């Protein structure tokens, strides 16, 4: 990688996605503009920057872009840069006062601020109202920023964004360090302890190596434990067991190249930030990050408290029976036995879980339950789902207002160990659909947000993929044995003789004795090319018979001959053949990305 340098002044931001920014700078001498990208792009105007980075060329246009590695403010001895630097947060000195300082000391102003700030007090602040207080605040912030400038220049070279550096700097006072530089020098793995800062442990190791920090230090091992547990949580695990091939000790040993004894020694100190629980049944220990333990235990406690409350029945059994007779007659339907059982369960229990596979009638049951709640006067209901798509399907299926959990309680779960919600829930019944996609953290926030609610109805398919976040909440609630569960097991959506659902259930049970007929077939081919040709030809036949919107092709991959890219290209050539080697075909969706 060849490092190049530019001098430039920020002009405008043209794109951002999270920390990543694309901005336009211009050379103050030639006025030539150039593009800068990165996670630490400075955006203060009228300040001259010394920019270091890698120059890359965009393949299609040949346009060159500077991928920023580091920068520093230069020419602070020039009036405009000096005034703007003092006006930037967190110093925030009035521009008129900054201009006055520069007029008095000219190019010596920086040296005076660093080495003889008393002159600044005597000439600027002494005569001002509350001058002593304003001076102490200003000069204190100046000194902190000068120290931070050196530390920032050091850290950005390791790929740590300015945004993360600001978070680290805010955490310094909490950890009782004098400044960020002192914190990093004392413990390079301090970075791993700060909420919302996601840095790979290898980066901390590089910094530690530069500072000659010992490889087997307790702080490094604690950081390694945290790193391993965070990765485990991204894979859905709330905790790891201490011992075993997949245990925490083994994972930390592999990640850090340390011994089991060294990891065990740190664990025996019961380090801050971790919760260790003895699992007598497995003769092992569960190791949690403290905030993950709070979610799990807190959620269990909330549910226990809710189950312990005395809740009046919506209707007694006779009233439910009468309601079901009227409801089925009015709507011209017949509810299956388990669907009726779900209605009875909701009438009697504070929390009910309704589960079942695709096509078993969960939505039909939910509509009957909502009608029963309306008939009993419990019509102030809150309908939620885990995702936007799920809430939209809920609206279409019930004809009622529904929204996502996040939007309902206005929760912020951006940082892994910090969370908040702004809105409480008050309703007669809370109905949560697609609950299998709700992780432990969001479920905990949801139950914390409940102010008043007579009933909770949880709907979901336990066989679906679990949530992206940590925890398998729906499955755990069902297996707890403390909550009323109704499992719908009669397929309503498919024909009785269709093997599709039956074979899907066999797959879930890891069985392979599938039932084949015209609705479920296995076609054997000699190679991928033959398979792709068969798929495309069959697709063309079916679309002519049923229409394009009625036929779908699913492929487990993007690339290769039977991947989605190749299959889509083959189908496009069949449906809309190119007449003149045209790039676009009839029906293609086009978006204009540049105005010229």
Regions flagged by a language model, labelled:
Residues 218-241:
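Positively charged, polyanion-binding regions of nucleic-acid-associated proteins
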Residues 248-319:
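Interdomain "pre-motor" coupling segment immediately N-terminal to P-loop NTPase/helicase cores
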Residues 320-350:
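Conserved pre-motif I regulatory segment
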Residues 462-596:
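Conserved helicase motor core of P-loop NTPases
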């Amino acid at each position: 990688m060849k490092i190049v340098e530019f001098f430039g002044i920020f002009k405008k931001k043209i794109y951002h996605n999270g920390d990543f920014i694309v901005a336009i700078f211009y050379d103050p001498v030639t006025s030539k503009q150039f593009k800068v990208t990165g996670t630490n792009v400075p955006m203060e105007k009228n300040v001259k920057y010394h920019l270091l980075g890698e120059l890359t060329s965009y393949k299609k246009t040949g346009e060159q872009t500077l991928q920023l590695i580091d920068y520093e403010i230069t020419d602070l001895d020039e009036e405009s840069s000096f005034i703007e630097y003092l006006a930037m947060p967190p110093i925030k000195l009035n521009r008129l006062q900054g201009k006055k300082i520069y007029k008095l000391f000219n190019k010596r102003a920086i040296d005076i601020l660093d080495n003889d700030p008393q002159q600044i007090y005597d000439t600027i602040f002494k005569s001002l109202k509350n001058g002593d207080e304003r001076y102490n605040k200003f000069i204190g912030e100046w000194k902190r920023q000068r120290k931070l400038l050196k530390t920032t220049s050091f850290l950005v070279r390791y790929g740590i964004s300015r945004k993360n550096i600001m978070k680290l700097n805010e955490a310094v006072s909490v950890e009782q360090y004098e400044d960020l530089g002192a914190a990093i020098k004392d413990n390079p793995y301090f970075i791993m302890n700060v909420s919302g800062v996601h840095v790979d442990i290898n980066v901390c190791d590089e910094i530690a190596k530069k500072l000659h920090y010992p490889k087997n230090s307790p702080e490094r091992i604690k950081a390694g434990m945290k790193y391993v547990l965070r990765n485990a949580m991204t894979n859905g695990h709330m905790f790891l067991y201490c011992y075993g091939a997949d245990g925490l000790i083994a994972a930390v040993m592999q990640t850090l190249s340390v011994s089991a004894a060294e990891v065990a020694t740190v664990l025996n100190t019961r380090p801050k930030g971790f919760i260790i629980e003895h699992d007598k049944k497995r003769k092992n220990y569960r190791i949690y990050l403290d905030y993950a333990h709070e979610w799990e235990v807190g959620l269990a406690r909330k549910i226990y408290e809710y189950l312990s409350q005395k809740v009046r029945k919506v209707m007694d059994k006779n009233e439910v029976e009468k309601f079901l007779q009227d409801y089925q007659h009015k709507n011209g339907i017949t509810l299956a036995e388990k669907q009726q059982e779900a209605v009875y369960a909701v009438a009697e229990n504070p929390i009910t879980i309704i589960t079942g596979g695709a096509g078993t009638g969960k939505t039909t049951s939910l509509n009957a339950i909502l009608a029963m709640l309306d008939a009993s006067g419990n019509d102030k209901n809150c309908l939620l789902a885990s995702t936007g798509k799920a809430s939209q399907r809920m609206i279409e299926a019930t004809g009622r207002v529904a929204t996502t959990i996040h939007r309902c309680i206005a929760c912020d779960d951006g940082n892994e160990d910090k969370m908040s919600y702004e809105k409480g829930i008050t309703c007669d019944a809370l109905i949560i659909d697609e609950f299998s996609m709700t992780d432990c953290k969001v479920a905990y926030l949801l139950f914390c947000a409940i102010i008043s609610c007579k009933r909770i109805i949880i709907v979901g398919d336990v066989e679906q993929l679990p949530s992206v976040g940590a925890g398998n909440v729906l499955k755990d609630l069902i297996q707890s044995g403390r909550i009323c569960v109704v499992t719908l097991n009669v397929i309503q959506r498919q024909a009785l003789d269709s093997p599709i659902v039956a074979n899907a259930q066999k797959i879930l049970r890891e069985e392979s004795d599938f039932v084949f007929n015209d609705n479920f077939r296995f076609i054997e081919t000699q190679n991928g090319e033959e398979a792709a040709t068969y798929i495309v030809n069959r697709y063309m036949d079916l679309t002519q018979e049923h229409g394009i919107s009625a036929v779908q092709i699913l492929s487990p991959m993007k690339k290769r001959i039977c991947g989605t890219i190749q299959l889509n290209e083959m189908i496009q050539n069949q449906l809309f053949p190119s007449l003149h080697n045209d790039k676009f075909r009839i029906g293609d969706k086009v978006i204009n990305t540049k105005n010229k």
